[in-house]
Regions:
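Bacterial N-terminal signal peptides that target proteins for export
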Residues: 1-8
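Boundary/junction segments of secreted and surface-exposed precursor proteins
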Residues: 21-42, 177, 183-220
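Low-complexity, serine/threonine/proline/glycine-rich extracellular segments that form mucin-like
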Residues: 26-31, 35-91
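A structural detector for beta-sheet-dominated domains
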Residues: 33-37, 46-48, 69-71, 107-109, ...
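Structured beta-strand segments within beta-sheet-rich domains
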Residues: 46-47, 89-137
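The transition from N-terminal targeting/processing segments to the mature protein
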Residues: 47, 57-59, 79-99, 117, ...
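Ser/Thr/Pro-rich, low-complexity mucin-like regions
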Residues: 117-173
Length: 220
């Protein structure tokens, strides 16, 4: 009976939290970044808790979205989910607001493999490999400043979002939401490969500091 009650509570809370945790929420506790992996070819999208929270192991993810901003000729292969299951669910090429850009959104489907948060550490969400001939930039959308942010000419909802609940902290259920992006030059800590339960320091990607975009050029 206790199991049934807990399951019902989880489902109902996730439904209500999904409504609350939408792209563009201005206050939150979770930060995203994108960088190259150790092979210098694959790109990874990571989440990290900010300094205000200390997540327990009893978290549950209810919603999520990651939107990449690339050149309009961008293509990729080998999308691999590492924390949660992610699928491409929208793409817009050359909108009038940013005709040189493409906006590719990846939606969260299920918390399998589970997204495991740890204080001051990165968790890898998914990876992908850009086409060999692509030499443009790849960055995460800035929800509040991008020219294609909602409302836009396509009536779409690009943006970054992650909504989680923590059942294991004192004081009752805690809610964590996406806050902003962070970039290289910060102390990112070790990465957590959620599906493999291993920790490995990630190499530094080359970023355009003023834009937070990852370059495909190899480090010199």
């Amino acid at each position: 009976m206790n199991t049934i009650r807990y399951t019902l509570l989880t489902v109902l809370t996730l439904i209500s939290f999904h409504i609350f945790a939408q792209p563009g929420v201005s206050a939150g506790n979770l930060q995203f970044t994108i960088k190259k992996m150790s092979d210098n070819v694959t790109f990874g999208v990571f989440v990290k808790p900010d300094a205000t929270i200390a997540p327990s192991k009893r978290t549950s993810t209810g919603s999520g979205q990651v939107t990449l901003v690339t050149s309009k000729d961008f293509t990729y292969d080998n999308l691999v989910s590492k924390g949660g299951t992610w699928v491409e669910n929208a793409r817009v090429n050359s909108p009038i607001e940013a005709p040189d850009n493409a906006y590719i959104s990846f939606g969260f489907v299920t918390d399998e493999p589970k997204i495991k948060l740890q204080s001051n550490e990165e968790t890898l969400l998914f990876t992908f490999v850009p086409a060999d001939d692509y030499d443009g930039s790849i960055s995460l959308i800035e929800n509040n400043n991008d020219p294609f942010s909602t409302p836009n000419s396509y009536g779409t909802n690009p943006g970054n979002d992650l909504g989680m609940m923590d059942f294991g902290v004192a004081g009752g259920i805690q809610y964590y939401t996406y806050a902003n992006n962070y970039f290289e030059g910060m102390d990112n800590g070790p990465a957590i490969l959620a599906s493999e339960k291993t920790e490995a320091a990630q190499p530094k990607a080359i970023f355009a500091a003023e834009k937070g975009t990852a370059s495909l050029r190899s480090p010199k």
